[in-house]
Design a protein with these regions (language model features):
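Beta-rich carbohydrate-recognition and catalytic domains
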Residues: 2-237, 241-255
Length: 255
């Protein structure tokens, strides 16, 4: 299948078993996701982003295998989601999917526009209402009450799913990663090796991603992981600047 649009459309429901879907270009595994695929009696659609594969010939392998017709679209339809019954009106909820721990909370005032925005990232499965496919979702607010969901900023890769962490506004550019007028934002997160097919037989490690556009998008640091595995289930880095020590300090959960 040649990718011509931004998203693949997967019909899903809550009443079938999870299937593994692998994406290959020739013999190279590009990604793997886990969804409740249901083309017989679907409840709604999910949209898998494939714009980065545009023009490529992608093989999509389903486990267990079923016959399926693939649809592509440039315009996801989430118009129904905020009208569904029982959705909370006060607490933040994602348009679709499963979410958990808030991560990397920070406030930032743009050096260019002067606009102050509160940023909240969170553990997020954009493809289903159960744990899995863990990304960092993103929402913003100007008053801490009204939140708007933005595009996810980190997706699973060959180091693993993207587990919890923290964010630092590097206003002094101690990292040297700043480019442009805005302060560079650093995210420290756990790459959960062994939690997806791409990261088979790898261990949990700690990684960095950085943003030069006020936290809207992030680039994964090319030297990741910055801390190798230091023990079973080491995860959830919290990083702060310690003025007395004149250095950053990281706390990790260890089991």
């Amino acid at each position: 299948m040649v990718i011509t649009k931004k998203y693949l459309v997967f019909p899903v429901s809550d009443f079938v078993k999870v299937r593994e879907i692998d994406f290959y270009n020739k013999d190279k595994l590009l990604d793997d996701i886990y969804i409740k695929l249901d083309y017989i009696n679907p409840k709604y659609n999910i949209y898998y982003p494939v714009e980065k594969y545009k023009g490529m010939n992608i093989d999509v392998i389903i486990h267990p295998d079923i016959d399926f017709r693939w649809d592509q679209t440039d315009e996801p339809d989430y118009t129904f989601v905020y009208n569904c019954p029982f959705r909370p009106k006060l607490h933040f909820t994602a348009a679709f999917g499963w979410l958990n721990d808030p991560n990397g909370l920070f406030e930032y005032t743009s050096k260019v526009t002067g606009e102050k925005v509160y940023n909240m990232y969170f553990q997020y499965n954009p493809y289903g209402n159960i744990w899995g496919n863990i990304h960092w979702g993103h929402a913003v607010s100007k008053d801490l009450l009204h939140w708007e969901q933005k595009s996810s900023v980190l997706a699973p890769d060959e180091l693993g799913m993207i587990f919890s962490g923290s964010a630092v506004v590097d206003s002094e550019n101690r990292s040297g990663l700043k480019s442009g007028e805005e302060d560079v934002i650093l995210i420290y997160y756990t790459a959960a090796g062994g939690t997806n097919k791409l990261s088979e037989n790898k261990k949990f490690t700690q990684c960095i991603a950085y943003s030069n556009d006020c936290g809207r998008t992030f680039v994964k640091y090319k030297e990741n992981p910055v801390i190798q595995n230091v023990g079973n289930d080491n995860r959830d880095p919290k990083v702060v600047w310690c003025e007395e020590m004149q250095c950053y300090v990281m706390a990790l959960y260890l089991k």
